[in-house]
From Swiss-Prot:
PROSITE patterns per the UniProt record, alphabetical: GLOBIN
Family affiliation: Belongs to the globin family.
GO MF annotation, one: oxygen binding
Residue ranges of coiled coil: none
GO cellular component, one term: extracellular region
Gene name of this polypeptide: CTT-7B8
Note: There are at least 12 different components in Midge globin.
Record keywords, A-Z: Heme, Iron, Metal-binding, Oxygen transport, Signal, Transport
Protein name stated in the entry: Globin CTT-VIIB-8
TM helices/strands, residue ranges: none
Binding site for heme b: 76, 111
Length: 161
């Protein structure tokens, strides 16, 4: 359940090389364009990587088409997207680095307890970037900003797994 919140982590930008204001703006504006598509985002991740779906007890072993339109699926998708939205909103401002670090560290700790691997975080990242690149204006500048944000996030999360 929180696995995708963890995956949401994929959107920070705080530590090793903080996002510039321009990079943060690119991440924030592209996220704003899709963040209302919670169910579609989670469905895209599950479709691309069924092993991630199987980390969620309420969705494990079920056909994606049969769960996609359920309240439970929508609720969980909203939790994940809300987490990502919070982290993204905090990015680009050095005074928020501690808050981002706390949120993302907790995400790593929570997902370690669930047996989520660094490889699965990588899968989530791949699926999220694929979704974004197909649903927002995606150029080299946007791709670079997202990659930097996700690299920063993973620098916090992966060592905690």
């Amino acid at each position: 359940m929180k696995f995708f919140a963890v995956l949401a982590l994929c959107i920070v930008g705080a530590i090793a090389s903080p996002l510039t204001a321009d990079e943060a703006s690119l991440v924030q504006s592209s996220w704003k364009a899709v963040s209302h598509n919670e169910v579609e985002i989670l469905a895209a991740v599950f479709a691309a990587y069924p092993d991630i779906q199987n980390k969620f007890p309420q969705f494990a072993g079920k056909d994606l088409a049969s769960i996609k339109d359920t309240g439970a699926f929508a609720t969980h998708a909203t939790r994940i997207v809300s987490f990502l939205s919070e982290v993204i909103a905090l990015s680009g401002n050095e005074s928020n680095a501690s808050a981002v670090n706390s949120l993302v560290s907790k995400l790593g700790d929570d997902h370690k307890a669930r047996g989520v691997s660094a490889a699965q975080f990588g899968e989530f990242r791949t699926a999220l970037v694929a979704y974004l690149s197909n649903h927002v204006s995606w150029g080299d500048n946007v791709a670079a900003a997202w990659n930097k944000a996700l690299d920063n996030t993973y620098a916090i999360v992966v060592p905690r797994l």
